[in-house]
């Protein structure tokens, strides 16, 4: 089926099912284009709550669909590709986290939303890359357990007086962005600003002109006087940047900055998901209720 035909059929089924399509910035360009809303993890969590649709088709990885199901239990949440998992989310397990909590009983657990529902249920509060610093600083505690991303934990630690106890996880896509990659791109494009995601290695962030979440990068590109940008995150964001600020030029920092899991969803899978109402994301109620408390606490934190 041609792309135009796929798009037409998807739109027809959206109306029939009273469905809405949500997509992360890292999805394929054509998937972002068919979506009703494209955003970062924080915005997508908020949008899942705001939408009055009966069905949410979540074009992203598994933890994103889980978050939508946690926050919107009365809606049917579908993942077009059930095998699209987040490697970083899989790096932390409940048993290990419980042991860490026993070692630090006074430390609340902050879980990055890039984690499973089960991990969120073991956490006091969640965070995204857009609000991690504000979330940690909102806590009445001297030390904080931060899971699963050690790089984001290091970034937060540099911006708080609290002791951060990190889990040893990381995003493989961002972790593959090396300092040498940045230096080469800076030499090739000396007038370009380097904007980086806080999931990058600390020595990469040292070279950044600006550090931000994916949505924060778009906002920065809109406001900055710079005309060129080296983008230190997953390459899919460039599509969103070009749509938001088309008059500027963007360079992906590395050819390896591509998340295979986020690229698994295509238009054919979105269509099949709507046709067959699959794959539905189910979160057990006991887990969902506890995870929702952590997400609700996050959503209540005001960010600058």
Curated annotation (Swiss-Prot):
It is found in: Cytoplasm. InterPro entries: NadA, NadA_sf, Quinolinate_synth_type2. It catalyses: iminosuccinate + dihydroxyacetone phosphate = quinolinate + phosphate + 2 H2O + H(+). Binds 1 [4Fe-4S] cluster per subunit. Its main location: cytoplasm. Pathway: Cofactor biosynthesis; NAD(+) biosynthesis; quinolinate from iminoaspartate: step 1/1. Pfam families: NadA (PF02445). [4Fe-4S] cluster binds at residues 86, 171, 259. GO terms for biological process: 'de novo' NAD biosynthetic process from L-aspartate. It comes from the Archaea. One of its GO terms (molecular function) is quinolinate synthetase A activity. Iminosuccinate binds at residues 24, 41, 112-114, 129, 197-199, 214. Its cofactor is [4Fe-4S] cluster. One of its GO terms (cellular component) is cytoplasm. The keyword Transferase applies. Keywords: 4Fe-4S, Cytoplasm, Iron, Iron-sulfur, Metal-binding, Pyridine nucleotide biosynthesis, Transferase. Its EC number is 2.5.1.72. NCBIfam families: nadA, PRK09375.1-2, PRK09375.1-4. Belongs to the quinolinate synthase family. Type 2 subfamily. PANTHER family: QUINOLINATE SYNTHASE, CHLOROPLASTIC, QUINOLINATE SYNTHETASE A. Catalyzes the condensation of iminoaspartate with dihydroxyacetone phosphate to form quinolinate. This is Quinolinate synthase. It comes from Methanosarcina mazei (strain ATCC BAA-159 / DSM 3647 / Goe1 / Go1 / JCM 11833 / OCM 88).
């Amino acid at each position: 089926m041609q792309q135009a035909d796929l798009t037409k059929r998807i739109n027809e089924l959206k109306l029939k099912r009273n469905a809405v399509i949500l997509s992360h910035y890292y999805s394929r360009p054509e998937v972002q284009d068919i979506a009703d809303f494209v955003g970062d993890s924080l915005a997508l969590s908020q949008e899942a709550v705001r939408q009055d649709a009966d069905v949410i088709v979540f074009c992203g990885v598994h933890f994103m669909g889980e978050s939508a199901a946690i926050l919107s239990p009365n809606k049917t949440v579908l993942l077009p590709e059930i095998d699209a998992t987040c490697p970083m989310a899989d790096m932390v397990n409940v048993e290990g986290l419980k042991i860490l909590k026993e070692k630090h009983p006074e430390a609340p657990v902050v879980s990055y939303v890039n984690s499973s529902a089960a991990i969120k249920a073991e956490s006091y509060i969640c965070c995204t890359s857009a609000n991690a610093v504000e979330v940690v600083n909102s806590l009445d505690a001297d030390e904080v357990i931060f899971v699963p991303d050690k790089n984001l934990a290091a970034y937060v630690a540099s911006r708080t007086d609290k002791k951060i106890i990190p889990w040893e996880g990381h995003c493989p896509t961002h972790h593959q962005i090396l300092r040498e990659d940045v230096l080469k791109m800076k030499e090739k494009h000396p007038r370009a600003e380097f904007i980086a995601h806080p999931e990058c290695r600390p020595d990469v962030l040292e070279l950044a002109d600006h550090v931000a979440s994916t949505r924060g990068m778009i906002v920065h590109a809109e406001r900055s006087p710079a005309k060129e940008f080296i983008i230190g995150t997953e390459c899919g964001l460039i599509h969103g940047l070009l749509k938001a600020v088309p008059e500027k030029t963007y360079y992906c920092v590395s050819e390896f900055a591509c998340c295979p899991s986020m690229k698994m969803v295509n238009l054919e899978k979105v269509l099949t998901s709507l046709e067959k109402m699959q794959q539905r994301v189910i979160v057990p109620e006991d887990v969902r209720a506890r995870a929702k408390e952590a997400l609700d606490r996050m959503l209540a934190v005001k960010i600058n």
